């Protein structure tokens, strides 16, 4: 899928319901879900994949990590101007830092979340809620705690 890049600095204030954390992080106008076309290496849906993981005795942490690894590949395929970082210190002056975590539980629920480091501040957009300030290391939204280690991306800023 091709995503429409946003060029309006007020877009995320005016069009809150059309954008989520992924839209905000990657600066696209569409609701961005890296799991939208999920298919693992065995051709399974997310639900089938979770069932297989639970059947094999995986815990929440292992499932969340594996899920993140699968989604990282989707993200890198979706955006040519995004790269995976080994650590956040690799960020270049012409890039924006994006933090990412996932959550999967044994009941079949899953989620992902992105945060953006912009103008010296961490920002996030939770679903259709407005963009807000956040802490880099606070990954508990009251319903879900994203327990895995943070994955970082760099997105090339538009000139």
Where are these regions (language model features)?
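Active-site-adjacent structural segments surrounding the nucleophilic cysteine of cysteine proteases
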Residues: 1-15
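Active-site nucleophilic cysteine motif
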Residues: 13-32, 39, 43-45, 64-68, ...
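...with weaker cross-activation on analogous glycine-rich loops/strands in unrelated enzymes
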Residues: 44-129
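Active-site or metal-binding loop neighborhoods of secreted/extracellular toxin and effector enzymes
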Residues: 121-159
């Amino acid at each position: 899928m091709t995503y429409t890049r946003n060029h309006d600095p007020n877009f995320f204030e005016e069009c809150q319901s059309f954008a989520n954390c992924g839209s905000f992080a990657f600066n696209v106008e569409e609701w961005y879900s890296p799991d939208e076309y999920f298919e693992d290496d065995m051709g399974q849906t997310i639900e089938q994949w979770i069932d297989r993981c639970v059947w094999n005795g995986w815990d929440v942490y292992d499932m969340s990590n594996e899920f993140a690894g699968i989604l990282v590949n989707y993200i890198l395929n979706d955006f040519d101007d995004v790269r995976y970082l080994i650590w956040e210190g690799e960020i270049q002056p012409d890039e924006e830092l994006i933090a990412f975590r996932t959550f999967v539980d044994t009941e079949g629920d899953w989620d992902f979340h992105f945060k953006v480091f912009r103008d010296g501040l961490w920002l996030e957009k939770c679903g259709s809620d407005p963009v807000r300030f956040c802490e880099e290391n606070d990954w508990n939204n009251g319903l879900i705690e994203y327990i895995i280690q943070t994955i970082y991306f760099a997105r090339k800023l538009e000139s």
